[in-house]
Amino acid sequence: MAALPMLWTGLVLLGLLGFPQTPAQGHDTVQPNFQQDKFLGRWYSAGLASNSSWFREKKELLFMCQTVVAPSTEGGLNLTSTFLRKNQCETKVMVLQPAGVPGQYTYNSPHWGSFHSLSVVETDYDEYAFLFSKGTKGPGQDFRMATLYSRAQLLKEELKEKFITFSKDQGLTEEDIVFLPQPDKCIQE
């Protein structure tokens, strides 16, 4: 049971940064005229969807985390995520580098020895953002993950439906999707 918090931590980072993968072939769509300055601030990881069998097995054990997005000195983003781990609040910082197109970022994971790509596909900046990662876990193993960021901890039903549609548009199914419950600590409104 002690391994569950570590698995949760890894999955939160998956949602934020994508799965350890090889560089993506081509680029996913990105929010038109993405404005990084409007994307900054506090977000909650409110929904995740993935075609990973591990994710499907563990998704019911996950909780919402809080991420503060700030500009990095290199023009990218610093993501400071706070989450519940072993019944204590833990914070991790990740730096996303710009990938040429506004709204697209890369991250090199020393832990996994891998390269990640992350795209902000759609956002209204004030209420929600849809992020998407894709790649391969190995020969012939396709991986996709959609993430719903929300400015509020409680989601409107319309936003849930919109995320379900977005996830299905990425080739994911209803059973691939989870809306994360709020933990009893570690995040603030």
UniProtKB/Swiss-Prot annotation:
Q: In which tissues is it expressed?
A: Abundant in the brain and CNS, where it is expressed in tissues of the blood-brain barrier and secreted into the cerebro-spinal fluid. In the eye, it is expressed in the pigmented epithelium of the retina and the nonpigmented epithelium of the iris and ciliary body, and accumulates within the interphotoreceptor matrix, photoreceptors, and aqueous and vitreous humors. In the male reproductive system, it is expressed in the testis and epididymis, and is secreted into the seminal fluid. It has also been detected in the cochlea.
Where does it mainly reside?
endoplasmic reticulum
- Kindly list the cysteine pairs connected by disulfide bridges: C89-C186
Sample GO molecular function, one term? retinoid binding
**Signal peptide residues on this chain, from the entry's feature table:** 1-24
Q: What does the record note about the induction of this protein?
A: By IL-1 beta and thyroid hormone. Probably induced by dexamethasone, dihydrotestosterone, progesterone, retinoic acid and retinal. Repressed by the Notch-Hes signaling pathway.
Extract one GO BP annotation from the record.
regulation of circadian sleep/wake cycle, sleep
Q: Glycosylation positions?
A: N51, N78
Q: Which GO terms describe its cellular component?
A: extracellular region; extracellular space; Golgi apparatus; nuclear envelope; nuclear membrane; perinuclear region of cytoplasm; rough endoplasmic reticulum
Where does the record place the modification Pyrrolidone carboxylic acid? Q25
- Catalyses which reaction? prostaglandin H2 = prostaglandin D2
Judged by the first EC level, this protein's enzyme class is isomerase
Query: Which positions are tagged coiled coil?
Result: none
Q: Localized where?
A: Rough endoplasmic reticulum; Nucleus membrane; Golgi apparatus; Cytoplasm, Perinuclear region
Known EC number(s)? 5.3.99.2
**What Pfam families does this protein's entry cite?**
Lipocalin
Record's family? Answer: Belongs to the calycin superfamily. Lipocalin family.
What's the subunit arrangement here? Monomer.
Write out the domain note.
Answer: Forms a beta-barrel structure that accommodates hydrophobic ligands in its interior.
Task: Say what the protein does.
Answer: Catalyzes the conversion of PGH2 to PGD2, a prostaglandin involved in smooth muscle contraction/relaxation and a potent inhibitor of platelet aggregation. Involved in a variety of CNS functions, such as sedation, NREM sleep and PGE2-induced allodynia, and may have an anti-apoptotic role in oligodendrocytes. Binds small non-substrate lipophilic molecules, including biliverdin, bilirubin, retinal, retinoic acid and thyroid hormone, and may act as a scavenger for harmful hydrophobic molecules and as a secretory retinoid and thyroid hormone transporter.
Identify this protein by name.
Prostaglandin-H2 D-isomerase
Which lineage ranks, top first, belong to the organism behind this chain? Eukaryota, Metazoa, Chordata, Craniata, Vertebrata
Gene that this sequence comes from: Ptgds
